């Protein structure tokens, strides 16, 4: 047990007295407090020590979960068959299709208590696009999402084909400039027309979405279809991720004598401890909690337990490599030295091997192994770069940076990405940015995000927040978007506003 009444009272009081939280945000935070205070299964002394030192991290899930962290329902099944639990028939009109989605989303849980995957909405709506009121209905739908799912981890997918619905969504989002929902274009240059892709680039420059996912590579990952959920997590549709925990490489490196000690001793030990913890959480979720026994999503086949995996996240590669190089008296730095980059690859190869040595009772869709994930960070991270990104302030020239991404992105089956803001003049050359994306993807890059230096909506690490909302929070004024508070602290701690702005 980890219950301390005095600390518990302080934590509750800090929530209920905060003027920067809405009622719903306060309610959700209060509901999470007990799960962070009580253990439901035994953890090892070694695991607890590594957590207390900040080398391992539970990722705000608490010590137990009662629903999967990321859920990607089969929305096509919903449109084919309807839903008995929610008394929804298969939609026959665009109005019914949108209403069906709006109702269904309300009942899809996640770690944030909001849906993190909205489906390939363009494909879902395309059969109904002959409706003469299509523009008004879709515009109203997008406004509904922004106002009723106040969390930009909710993620819509488009493409790879161009559709009337997809074109309209991009047009309206360019106009609305909302932070919610996040959007990804599943991009394949052999399928996606350049004119549609360029419209997506222009939309991104105006409101930081859509991002571009390398569909040609991602579609190879799973036996069935995949989706991009939450930040940029590539996961199976009709499944998702049971849980996500992470290793903080930079903090672990502080304990190392040198790179050999780090790779051969510290890293395997920490990986084993984290894998054991992830497995314990999955077993509790599947075998003891109610979700996989009684939830309608499971009972009606919208998700299946065999399509879920466990995510093994990492952060701080940049700082880890630089610290190990310093300890060995070497001048090379991550991104700027072949020796430093080779060390990073050795770390990833070793970590992948350690994770693959652990056999999970579940995680059928990833051969009973956990999936490596380049985690984007949390709001309390300080001088810890997301995943394998080069630190803000140390960015490479653009083409070299894209090549660097291409070397490291392929290690991460369940998600990785990089962010490249451009100056305002880039809107005159969307074709040039599209060429950069094509080039990066041909080099192995998996996920590309951009926004314009002068737009209000920006990508923090993997999610979207309005700069104007951050300014309000700075004055203690509540804003509707729940994860804007995380963006506020990441701006303070992670130099988000100092990210290198590119020119064409």
Predicted regions and their residues:
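Conserved phosphate/anionic-ligand binding catalytic regions in large, soluble enzymes, centered on
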Residues: 116, 304-320
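Conserved catalytic cores of very large enzyme subunits
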Residues: 2-306, 327, 333-337, 356-504
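Short secondary-structure subsegments characteristic of cysteine-rich extracellular domains
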Residues: 331-354
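A conserved active-site cap/scaffold subdomain adjacent to cofactor or substrate pockets
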Residues: 267-271, 313-316, 321, 325
């Amino acid at each position: 047990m980890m219950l301390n009444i005095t600390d518990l009272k302080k934590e509750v009081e800090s929530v209920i007295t905060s003027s920067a939280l809405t009622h719903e945000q306060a309610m959700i935070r209060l509901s999470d407090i007990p799960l962070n205070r009580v253990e439901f299964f035994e953890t090892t002394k070694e695991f607890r020590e590594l957590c207390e030192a900040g080398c391992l991290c539970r990722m705000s899930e608490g010590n137990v979960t009662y629903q999967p962290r990321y859920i990607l329902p089969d929305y096509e099944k919903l449109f084919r068959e309807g839903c008995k639990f929610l008394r929804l028939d298969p939609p026959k009109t665009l109005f019914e299709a949108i209403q069906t989605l709006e109702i269904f989303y309300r009942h899809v849980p996640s770690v944030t208590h909001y849906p993190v995957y909205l489906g390939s909405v363009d494909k879902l709506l395309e059969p109904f696009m002959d409706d003469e009121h299509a523009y008004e209905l879709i515009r109203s739908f997008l406004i509904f999402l922004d106002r009723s799912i106040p969390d930009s981890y909710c993620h819509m997918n488009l493409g790879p084909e161009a559709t009337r619905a997809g074109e309209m969504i991009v047009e309206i989002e360019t106009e609305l400039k909302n932070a919610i929902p996040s959007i990804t274009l599943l991009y394949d240059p052999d399928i996606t027309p350049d004119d549609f892709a360029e419209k997506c680039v222009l939309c991104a420059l105006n409101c930081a979405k859509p991002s571009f996912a390398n569909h040609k590579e991602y579609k190879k990952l799973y036996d069935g279809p995949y989706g991009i959920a939450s930040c940029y997590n590539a996961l199976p549709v009709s499944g998702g991720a049971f849980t996500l925990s992470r290793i903080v490489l930079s903090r672990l490196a502080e304990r190392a004598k040198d790179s050999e000690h780090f790779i051969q001793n510290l890293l395997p030990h920490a990986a084993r401890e984290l894998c054991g913890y992830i497995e314990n959480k999955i077993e509790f979720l599947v075998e003891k909690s109610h979700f996989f026994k009684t939830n309608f999503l499971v009972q009606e086949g919208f998700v299946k337990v065999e399509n879920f995996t466990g995510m093994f996240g990492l952060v701080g590669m940049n700082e880890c490599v630089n610290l190990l190089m310093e300890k060995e008296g070497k001048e090379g730095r991550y991104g700027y030295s072949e020796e430093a980059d080779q060390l990073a690859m050795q770390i990833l190869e070793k970590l992948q091997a350690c994770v693959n040595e652990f056999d999970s009772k579940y995680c059928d869709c990833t051969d009973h192994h956990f999936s490596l994930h380049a985690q984007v960070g949390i709001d309390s991270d300080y001088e810890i770069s997301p995943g394998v990104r080069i630190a803000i302030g140390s960015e490479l020239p653009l083409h070299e940076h894209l090549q660097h991404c291409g070397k490291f992105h392929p290690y991460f089956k369940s998600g990785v990405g990089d962010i490249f803001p451009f100056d305002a003049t880039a809107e005159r050359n969307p074709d040039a940015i599209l060429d950069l994306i094509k080039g990066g993807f041909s080099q192995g890059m998996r996920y590309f995000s951009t926004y314009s230096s002068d737009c209000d909506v920006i990508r923090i690490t993997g999610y979207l927040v309005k700069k104007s909302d951050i300014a309000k929070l700075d004055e203690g004024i509540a804003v509707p978007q729940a994860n804007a508070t995380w963006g506020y602290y990441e701006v303070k701690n992670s130099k988000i506003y100092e990210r290198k702005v590119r020119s064409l």
